[in-house]
């Protein structure tokens, strides 16, 4: 392998670092709304009282709060489905740059909602930042995947998930009552998102456009070559250019790929099914349910400040994403995803047993804590980071934007459904709710084992051609070559 293929240059890290600021925004806005719930609800009550001269009815308060939380996912669904509209017209980098306008508008609306005595401003701000985050979950993995050398694509792709979990952790810390999660500073807590947006606006103009976009979509070979030299830190980028040109020639032979075509064409049907199921394996794994349960479990275990224990789980979240970052190019995507799913299923069983026996055996709360940390750790080994960047790997340049839009929409929709339904299912099933997630995790494990190929070390065109052959004749590759057994390596 060419030594330059694993070289991490300053320009490459600037490009990836500038992009994943958007991932940090996604994580921050996912986690920020939980801590200040009580003080924001009190703001809703005061606003209602100021307008109508009476306290807000409890059902109205519950509805407004649920809307404040859920509207973020609705915005995300709309944003994720719109990815292709921007990246093909404006490019990957410019799309990320333009979308910061949404972050600034959202920051102003949420930051001044208390001053304006308007909960509508806060809810609208949550919707707008949701649209921004939906777009970001498409833009960032696509851009990072296209600027990264093949040998580093998995490791750098994991930085998207690292940005998300760091954002969640920052939100948990900033949301402490002693910092910004109080009646005076919660507007600042919600509007501080203007800082990473401003930083991204400063950095992105110095980042290169995706060389694949320049060559394949714009046919600007000289610019693509110049960008590649800076990204790779070498004057000889012939191999990269040839691989992109081959992908471009293949794209010219294909008709324009729409979202409907992804499901109609045999060449795309299997990879889009894999992309959607992997996104579902992330959101339907039960990770949100675990965070929902964590505070009450820590309280039962006698933890004086359960919020700090919840932050501890956020630190575990971050630490194991870093672990995944270093092993993804060695172990492979498929292997890590399988290990993560299996580990989560085991921890879900432990959690079910511990929660069911908690009243009779108080020490079971400690087993619950171990199971929670284990569940979070295994999530970040596989189902957390892998689904985001493997979608970009499964498709060539032509269908990639449409595929990422479909996958992102699936992720946000399932996130919304879990957020809306979990409370009711938990009331119905009690501690046995994790049996549902255990069954789902086992099903996702079986699907991954039999259907998901290892993409480590393969170029985009090699992966796509494997599916084309699989969908057509299987003449050049056997199923064993395309769908490696657990832990198999795919050398180019």
From Swiss-Prot:
The modification Phosphoserine is found at residues 226, 465, 490. The keyword Lipoprotein does not apply. Phosphorylation at Ser-226 by PKC promotes glucose uptake by increasing cell membrane localization. Disruption phenotype: Early embryonic lethality. Residues 34-66, 113-120, 177-185, 294-306, 356-365, 423-429 are extracellular. One of its GO terms (cellular component) is Z disc. Pfam families: Sugar_tr. The uptake of glucose is inhibited by cytochalasin B. Glucose uptake is increased in response to phorbol ester 12-O-tetradecanoylphorbol-13-acetate (TPA) treatment: TPA-induced glucose uptake requires phosphorylation at Ser-226. Residues 468-492 are annotated as: Disordered. GO terms for biological process: cellular hyperosmotic response; cellular response to glucose starvation; cellular response to mechanical stimulus; cerebral cortex development; D-glucose import; D-glucose import across plasma membrane; D-glucose transmembrane transport; dehydroascorbic acid transport. The modification Phosphothreonine is found at residue 478. Facilitative glucose transporter, which is responsible for constitutive or basal glucose uptake. Has a very broad substrate specificity; can transport a wide range of aldoses including both pentoses and hexoses. Most important energy carrier of the brain: present at the blood-brain barrier and assures the energy-independent, facilitative transport of glucose into the brain. In association with BSG and NXNL1, promotes retinal cone survival by increasing glucose uptake into photoreceptors. Required for mesendoderm differentiation. Belongs to the major facilitator superfamily. Sugar transporter (TC 2.A.1.1) family. Glucose transporter subfamily. This is Solute carrier family 2, facilitated glucose transporter member 1.
């Amino acid at each position: 392998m060419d030594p330059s293929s694993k070289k991490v240059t300053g320009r490459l890290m600037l490009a990836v670092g500038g992009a994943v600021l958007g991932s940090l925004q996604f994580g921050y806005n996912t986690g920020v709304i939980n801590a200040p719930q009580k003080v924001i609800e009190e703001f809703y009550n005061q606003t209602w009282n100021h307008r109508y001269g009476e306290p807000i009815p409890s059902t109205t308060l519950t509805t407004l709060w649920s809307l404040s939380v859920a509207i973020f996912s609705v915005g995300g669904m709309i944003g994720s489905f719109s990815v292709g509209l921007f990246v093909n017209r404006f490019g990957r980098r410019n799309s990320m740059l333009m979308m910061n306008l949404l972050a600034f508008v959202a920051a102003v609306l949420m930051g001044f909602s208390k001053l304006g005595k308007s909960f509508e401003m806060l809810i609208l701000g949550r919707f707008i930042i949701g649209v921004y985050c939906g777009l970001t979950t498409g833009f960032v993995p696509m851009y990072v995947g296209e600027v990264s050398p093949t040998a580093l694509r998995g490791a750098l792709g994991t930085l998207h998930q690292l940005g998300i979990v760091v954002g969640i952790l920052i939100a948990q810390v900033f949301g402490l009552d002693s910092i910004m999660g109080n009646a005076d500073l919660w507007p600042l807590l919600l509007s501080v998102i203007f800082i990473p947006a401003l930083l991204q606006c400063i950095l992105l103009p110095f980042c290169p456009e995706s060389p694949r976009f320049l060559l394949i979509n714009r046919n600007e070979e000289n610019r693509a070559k110049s960008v590649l030299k800076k990204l790779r830190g070498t004057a000889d980028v012939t191999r990269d250019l040839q691989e992109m040109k081959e992908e471009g020639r293949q794209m010219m032979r294909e008709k324009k790929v729409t979202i409907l075509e992804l499901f109609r064409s045999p060449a795309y049907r299997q990879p889009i099914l894999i992309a959607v199921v992997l996104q579902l394996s992330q959101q339907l794994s039960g990770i949100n349910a675990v965070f929902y349960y964590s505070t009450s479990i820590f309280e039962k275990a006698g933890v004086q400040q359960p919020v700090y224990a919840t932050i501890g789980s956020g630190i575990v979240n971050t630490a194991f994403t870093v672990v995944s970052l270093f092993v993804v190019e060695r172990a492979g995507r498929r292997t890590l995803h399988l290990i993560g799913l299996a580990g989560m299923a085991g921890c879900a069983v432990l959690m079910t047993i511990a929660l069911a026996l908690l009243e009779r055996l108080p020490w079971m709360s400690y087993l619950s804590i171990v199971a929670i940390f284990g569940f979070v750790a295994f999530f970040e080994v596989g189902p957390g980071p892998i689904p985001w960047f493997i979608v970009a790997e499964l498709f060539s340049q032509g269908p990639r934007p449409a595929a990422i839009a479909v996958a992102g929409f699936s992720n946000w929709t399932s996130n919304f459904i879990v957020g809306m339904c979990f409370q009711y299912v938990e009331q119905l099933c009690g501690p046995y709710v994790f049996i549902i997630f255990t069954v789902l995790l086992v099903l996702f494990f079986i699907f991954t084992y039999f259907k998901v190929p290892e993409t480590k070390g393969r170029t985009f065109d090699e992966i796509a051609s494997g599916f084309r052959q699989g969908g057509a004749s299987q003449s050049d590759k056997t199923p064993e070559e395309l769908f490696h057994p657990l832990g198999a390596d795919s050398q180019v």
